[in-house]
Swiss-Prot record:
Lineage, top ranks: Eukaryota, Metazoa, Chordata, Craniata, Vertebrata
Quaternary structure and interacting proteins, as annotated: Heterodimer. Interacts with a catalytic subunit and with beta-gamma G protein dimers.
Protein name per its UniProtKB record: Phosphoinositide 3-kinase regulatory subunit 5
One GO process term, biological-process aspect: G protein-coupled receptor signaling pathway
Name of the gene: pik3r5
Superkingdom as given in the UniProt entry: Eukaryota
InterPro entries: PIK3R5/6
Organism: Xenopus laevis (African clawed frog)
Annotated keywords: Cell membrane, Cytoplasm, Membrane, Nucleus
Length: 879
């Protein structure tokens, strides 16, 4: 038997507790799952106590992976990979003599032949291990650098996390945790010192002398720290790209780091190991977060990120200065050559934050340059009607050019000096706002630009040049006319031209996971029940429509959506809560809350989170499992307030939110459904839902509940007492073969509901995804002695994929989407429900649809792309 220490035994026990119940062979009662979601958080707290614990956890995880592979415990493979990734990511130092990474590479390499998602997960793990062998700690550096928005010479990527909360539905403790995350940003100087300490320690170990290094760095100004960190980052990035053996790469990296340290006067010749030096754990800072109150069917509030994010400055100061120094010389060279050599404007450089031209290897660079040239020539020629004639005699051209070159140099020097002076007295927020006003001119109709109605007037006057038009060469100096002549003005013709040329810029596809051209990532974290998930679905659909006509958010950001289920607070519904101390309580295995009225209708459900949890057990354990804990436990910190630590201690909920955002990298696509609604007035409206659509009495009940205390005087009748109505229900049932069978009939009923079928694993097949049609039919209506009618109800359940519901005999019915009291539509006479397709493909589908609605093309999904909501998960879709 192998001798182990007490710490190793505790880590092994904590690891087994994290994996307990994830295997399909283990059956856990729902009554005993309350504390399972805290197992991983407890493991992190245990490992963070000492720097050597990370390597112990990595070794234990690797051994458990071999055992899971041998025993066929496939459900454990992705959680084990995530825990190994965490251990190596947070390890302050892995000795060169350690065989941990080579062994892991050998073990993980066998999973490349496995089906998805295992092959994708371990392919990323192999890339991660390979980079860590070449440049230790580079993944940690990239993660923290992007979360804090720290630019370098080689990279200016950033990641912003947005927390969308609804104060009417969330407990006050949750709101305080969200505010705590937003206010946890630490000073940039402290972050740079921590990153430099981690960088040296990951490569040099005890030779880095972390404490002395930190004391030396704290006395340096921020500008000097940024310069040092940029040099160190370039050395690490170069080490990952150099084509030499990993061992030699690490030695070369050490030499480069020591060279930078000696140049900056950090080590001062003290690079040896001492008895007092030891590996210090480097705590990861809290990601930069923004908290907004949100309860709308759109994401317009996200446009505020464009104004608040500091990384939206055009370029770093050092890069801008280098470009400005060589710009005029290059312009003169181009003018002497007659403008034949293409010159790209500095705004469109590859390192610029906003714009990314197609640079993939698949695209022809000559074609892209020719397109840019044609656009530039078109733009210049189109401005001919707006530019003054500027007649100049040929005899004066030479002398005028020489004199104007000198004037141009003098103006450039003066403008540069003015810009430097202005930057000294301007805050970052003012700089970002000014640049945003000048650079976002094409999207005048976008809601973000409503505070700037005269934005076109703020565009600086410039000859034949624009922030939005690729420019191959500057107009010759002689085109600069006399100052007495009228100056050109950019009118509607300029704006129309820019809108027509937006296809020249590369924009990230919505559901693409392979295109990494965006330098900025926007994490969108939403909290709530199925009602909030429905709002996210409608907001996502509206976002696609807006961005397809005038891209703004998707032009700058790669969007990632995160969903944390929370039960609706008692203040948002009229019914009391089940447990006053557990607003997230959900003991039922189906994810539905036991809160029901006397007629059996759920006031709030969490079916979407249950759907995700079935496909991703690690999400179910660590994110959905939070609903089993009380608010007081979720909002408490791991340490008391009077204890001093290097970083701010965060509540358990905050730690798990950050863990979810950092480690959930694979998207799960949730099908959206479209409801085409016709009113009795003849008007039509199209809505989107994701979980349920209710018609009739159940929709009326939600409207009555939403009235608050007034619902008592309105009175609530059950299905047995209400007046029924007649509906014509036409629905399609899909089979395994892909054929559809249509049924048509009239029903006298009180309520009809369409719910996403997501309660069992068999219902999650993408080819068989369907809706549950529930009809409460009145089979007999009796009159009692009190002259009050009494309905005998028969409830039927049918699995469908499309449906059409039409009111008969001149009647109407109410309709409610995703349990949202604000989305109750009255006086509806017809409702068509079908899967939602992408806007660009819907017209094609309608053109190819047969005249009869019930005889739609059976292979429609083969020609039209379905519109799905991407939710970030740990494992992704299971095979």
């Amino acid at each position: 038997m192998q001798n182990t220490s007490c710490t190793e035994d505790r880590i092994q026990h904590a690891l087994e507790r994290c994996l307990h119940g994830l295997s399909g062979s283990t059956d856990i009662s729902s009554n005993w799952t309350a504390g399972l979601c805290l197992n991983y958080w407890s493991l992190e707290e245990l490992v963070n106590r000492d720097a050597t614990n990370y390597i112990i956890l990595a070794e234990k995880t690797l051994a458990r992976t071999r055992e899971a592979q041998k025993n066929g415990e496939y459900e454990l493979l992705t959680p084990l990979a995530l825990m190994f990734y965490f251990a190596v990511l947070r390890a302050p130092y892995i000795p060169e003599t350690s065989d941990l990474l080579p062994k892991a590479f050998e073990v993980f390499h066998t999973f490349l032949t496995w089906p998805a998602p295992y092959c994708h997960v371990y392919q990323e793990m192999l890339s991660f291990i390979s980079e860590e062998q070449k440049a230790p700690g580079i993944t940690y550096q990239r993660l923290v650098r992007t979360e804090q928005g720290i630019p370098t010479r080689s990279s200016c990527s950033s990641t912003a996390t947005v927390l969308l909360v609804n104060p009417a539905e969330l407990p006050s403790e949750f709101l305080s945790v969200a505010e705590q995350l937003s206010n946890a940003e630490q000073p940039i100087q402290q972050t740079l010192v921590s990153l430099i300490q981690h960088l040296f320690q990951a490569s040099l170990g005890t030779h880095a002398h972390t404490e002395e290094l930190g004391a030396s760095l704290k006395s340096r100004p921020i500008e000097k720290l940024q310069e040092i960190y940029s040099d160190l980052t370039e050395a690490m990035e170069h080490a990952t790209m150099a084509d030499i053996k990993p061992g030699k790469k690490r030695e070369s990296l050490k030499a480069k780091l020591l060279e930078v340290a000696e140049k900056a006067g950090l080590m001062q010749g003290n690079t040896g190991s001492s008895l007092t030096s030891r590996i210090q754990p480097i705590f990861m800072p809290v990601a930069k977060c923004y908290t907004y109150s949100w309860d709308q069917d759109d994401f317009d509030i996200l446009n505020q990120i464009l104004l608040s994010e500091s990384h939206l400055e055009s370029l770093e100061d050092d890069v801008t200065e280098e470009d400005e120094e060589v710009d005029f010389e290059e312009v003169d060279d181009k003018d002497e050559d007659g403008g034949k050599s293409p010159k790209q404007d500095s705004v469109f450089s590859n390192s610029y934050v906003y714009w990314n031209f197609p640079s993939d290897s698949k695209e022809d660079p000559s074609m892209s340059m020719s397109n840019l040239a044609s656009h530039s020539m078109t733009f210049v020629s189109s401005l001919s009607s707006c530019v003054d004639s500027g007649y100049v005699e040929d005899s004066d051209e030479g002398s005028q050019e020489i004199s104007e070159i000198g004037e141009y140099q003098e103006e450039r020097a003066n403008n540069k000096l003015k810009q430097k002076i202005c930057q000294l007295f301007k805050t970052k927020g003012h700089q970002a706002k000014d640049k945003l006003k000048a650079e976002l001119s094409p999207c005048i109709s976008h809601p973000l630009l409503s505070p700037f109605p005269d934005i076109s007037k703020t565009i600086p006057l410039r000859r034949a040049g624009s922030m939005y038009t690729p420019q191959l060469s500057r107009i010759p100096v002689r085109s600069k006319r006399s100052k007495s002549l009228p100056q050109p003005a950019f009118g509607t013709q300029f704006l129309d031209l820019q809108l027509s040329q937006k296809v020249a810029f590369k924009r990230r596809p919505f559901l693409s996971c392979d295109d990494d051209t965006k330098v900025s990532t926007l994490r969108i974290v939403v909290f709530g029940s199925d009602r909030i998930s429905g709002k996210v679905a409608r907001a996502y659909s509206n976002l696609r429509l807006k961005e397809s006509s005038c891209p703004l958010l998707t032009r700058f950001f790669k969007l990632q959506f995160y969903y944390i289920p929370v039960k609706r607070s008692s203040s948002s519904t009229n019914a009391p809560m089940t447990n006053a101390e557990s607003p997230l309580k959900s003991p039922s295995p189906s994810g539905r809350f036991p809160l029901q009225d006397v007629f059996g209708d759920e006031a709030s459900t969490n079916d979407i989170s249950h759907y995700i949890g079935i496909l991703d057990p690690w999400y179910k354990r660590n994110i959905m499992g939070l609903m089993d804990l009380s608010t007081s436990m979720l909002c408490q910190s791991s340490k008391e307030e009077n204890e001093t630590t290097e970083t701010t201690t965060m509540p358990i909920l905050a730690d798990m939110v950050l863990y979810y955002c950092r480690f959930a990298t694979r998207s799960l696509l949730l099908q959206l459904y479209r409801a085409e609604i016709t009113f009795d007035s003849g008007g039509k409206q199209t809505e989107v839902f994701i979980q349920c659509l209710e018609l009739g009495h159940s929709a009326d009940l939600r409207a009555i509940r939403a009235s608050g205390p007034g619902c008592k005087r309105l009175g609530i009748d059950g299905d047995q007492d209400v007046i029924p109505f007649t509906l014509q229900i036409v629905y399609s049932k899909s089979t395994v073969s892909g054929r559809s069978r249509w049924s048509n009939g009239e029903k006298v009923c009180t309520s009809v509901s369409l719910r996403k079928a997501c309660n069992t694993y068999e219902e999650l097949d993408s080819k068989m995804e369907c809706l549950n049609l529930t009809v409460r039919e009145v089979v007999k209506r009796q009159n009692s002695k009190t002259k009050k009618s009494f309905n005998q109800i028969c409830t039927s359940h049918i699995k469908i994929d499309k449906a059409q519901i039409i009111a008969q005999h001149g009647g109407t019915f109410p309709l409610c989407l995703d349990q949202d009291e604000r989305k109750i539509l009255q006086r509806v006479i017809k409702c068509e429900v079908s899967p939602c397709y992408k806007p660009e493909d819907r017209d094609f589908c309608r053109r190819n649809r047969r005249p009869s609605w019930s005889q739609a093309s059976q292979n429609q999904s083969e020609f039209c792309s379905l519109l799905c909501l991407p939710i970030a998960t740990f494992c992704g879709a299971q095979p």
